[in-house]
Amino acid sequence: MNPYRSTIFWFLASFFFVSCAKETIITNNDAPNYNEVSTLLIENYVNRVYIDFIGREPLDSEMVLEVGKLKAADLAFDARRKMIENLQTDTSFIEGDSSYRRAYYHRMYNLSKARVIEGASNSEINQKMGIIKAQMKQDSINGNWAAYDENKRKVEKYQKVLDCDHEFEQGLIYIDSVFARMINNGIYDFINMNSFNFVNASFDNLLYRFPTGDEFNRAYNVIEYNQTELIFGQGASNKDEYIQAMVASSNFHEGIIMWLYQNLLQRFPNSAETAHHLDYFSQTRDLQEVQVQIAISDEYAGFD
């Protein structure tokens, strides 16, 4: 084989396998000497992982166990991955949490609410549903069935927000559906009153940018006038269809990656980091894997 062609072949083959591997991570070129990482830094890392992934600090017993495992593995990326994946997936009973998995998904549910509906509590949502249900009863007494049906739709949208907590955990919905529900209810509408504010807020909250003039005009026509427009490459003629087009777009997928970096690293990803995660996430909607790749990095761990 021609040496030049052979070199190209092995380069492309290596690139293919590295690109497709789930465990691919972005790290610094010069890895630190992990033998010099103090116990305190390792404890800080474990503490941060527990808070970010299940919303609490580790118990003393958990800290001792996790630090011991990480030290025994010389802080290997695989050991970090196992710790994080255990918090995401383990269903064993944990007093106070039900399980790590339940605590993790409840944490993601609360983070999602915090992102777009100002962290509205379940009790607040239930209270609003109760008020509407009382009105529905009055509507039925008065025979005002149009109002009854409209209020029923409002209740259903609130209920879908509450259902996210367990349906996301059970794999019945992906993160795109979670956020579609989070911006399609009375609380979000109250925060962002009228179509003008709703369009700008939905772009800002989910995409981390404001719409261009053309995007705004199209979205406004859909929401305000139920006029059919092309939104993110899809036809939409009402608010529900506009939301579905938005969360199905690559723009939204980039927004999810930005959101995860903000949550875990308190910064936005650079273009290389976004590109690294985007293709995989767009194909799989595997939010958990993107989180893992960020949280096993030396930057996140504080080992760099």
Where are these regions (language model features)?
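Bacterial Sec-dependent N-terminal signal peptides
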Residues: 1-33
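Composition-driven recognition of low-complexity segments enriched
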Residues: 20-304
